[in-house]
Amino acid sequence: MPKASEVKKNAAIEHNDKVYVVKDINKLTPSGRAGASLYRMRLYEVTTGAKADESFKADEMIKTADFVRQPVTFSYIDGDEYVFMNSEDYTPYNINKETIEEELLFIAEDTTGLQVMIVNGSAVGIELPPNVELVITETDPSIKGASASARTKPATLSTGLTVQVPEYISSGERIKISTSEHKFVSRADK
């Protein structure tokens, strides 16, 4: 069993006899010298999707839930459900839009490296690859000779995500985005 300080985002844990997926973690450090760090976690219950905020001491042991990851590709939208297809055996997995709201900003039709997280036979979330490639739909015109400049400008991507990009990048270009930092990494390989 890992300590609370070792739990990562998107981990499946058991707490109060229920299985949760950790969506966000904030480390709180008390101002007193003897105070131990606290980890405040935003949890989503697997079966109902109910949100819960829980605090754990840094050295508190947390039981991880058994879950499986399967490689998937985005297939289509069915009402409020997003359907992902298993890349190996073509099993469809329906996931509610609210459950993967943050991840949707990085998922386009051709996004590769996605994995569905399955707990007790049901899909509970999507795990993103470290970087994804997306197309810029709108940004200010590029400035010739600006490659030496470190200045940036906002760019809206095909999924609606807005990131800062270097001035020499223009609309229609395909770029790599870090999914953990929400930042521009580089131009995509052609």
Curated annotation (Swiss-Prot):
PROSITE patterns associated with the record: EFP (PS01275)
Protein name listed in UniProt: Elongation factor P-like protein
Matching InterPro entries: Elong-fact-P_C, NA-bd_OB-fold, Rib_uL2_dom2, Transl_elong_fac_P/YeiP, Transl_elong_KOW-like, Transl_elong_p-like_YeiP, Transl_elong_P/YeiP_cen, Transl_elong_P/YeiP_CS
GO biological process: peptide biosynthetic process
Gene3D superfamilies registered for this protein in UniProt: 2.30.30.30, Nucleic acid-binding proteins
Coiled coil location: none
Superkingdom assignment: Bacteria
Molecular functions per Gene Ontology: translation elongation factor activity
Family stated for the protein in its record: Belongs to the elongation factor P family.
One Pfam short name: EFP
GO cellular component terms given for this protein: cytoplasm
PANTHER family given in the database record: ELONGATION FACTOR P (PTHR30053), TRANSLATION ELONGATION FACTOR KOW-LIKE DOMAIN-CONTAINING PROTEIN (PTHR30053:SF14)
